């Protein structure tokens, strides 16, 4: 049985505003 809360993949989105790094968004794909 697989743990449904386990994140198997993560996708990172680097966010830039006016050419400056504004942070990173991490999405967990199950």
UniProtKB/Swiss-Prot annotation:
Principal location listed in the UniProt entry: other
Catalytic activity: [protein]-peptidylproline (omega=180) = [protein]-peptidylproline (omega=0)
Class in the EC hierarchy, top level: isomerase
Gene Ontology annotations for the cellular component aspect, listed alphabetically: endoplasmic reticulum; intracellular membrane-bounded organelle
UniProt xrefs under InterPro entries: Cyclophilin-like_dom_sf (IPR029000)
Compartments where located: Microsome; Endoplasmic reticulum
EC number(s) stated in the UniProt entry for this protein: 5.2.1.8
Domain PPIase cyclophilin-type: 12-30
GO molecular function: cyclosporin A binding; peptidyl-prolyl cis-trans isomerase activity
Regulation: Inhibited by cyclosporin A (CsA).
Sorted UniProt keywords: Chaperone, Endoplasmic reticulum, Isomerase, Microsome, Rotamase
Biological role: PPIases accelerate the folding of proteins. It catalyzes the cis-trans isomerization of proline imidic peptide bonds in oligopeptides.
Subunit structure: Monomer.
UniProt record similarity statement: Belongs to the cyclophilin-type PPIase family.
Protein name: Peptidyl-prolyl cis-trans isomerase, microsomal
Lineage, uppermost ranks: Eukaryota, Viridiplantae, Streptophyta, Embryophyta, Tracheophyta
């Amino acid at each position: 049985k697989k743990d449904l809360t386990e994140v198997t993949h993560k996708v990172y989105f680097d966010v830039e505003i006016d050419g400056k790094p504004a942070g990173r968004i991490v999405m967990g794909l199950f």
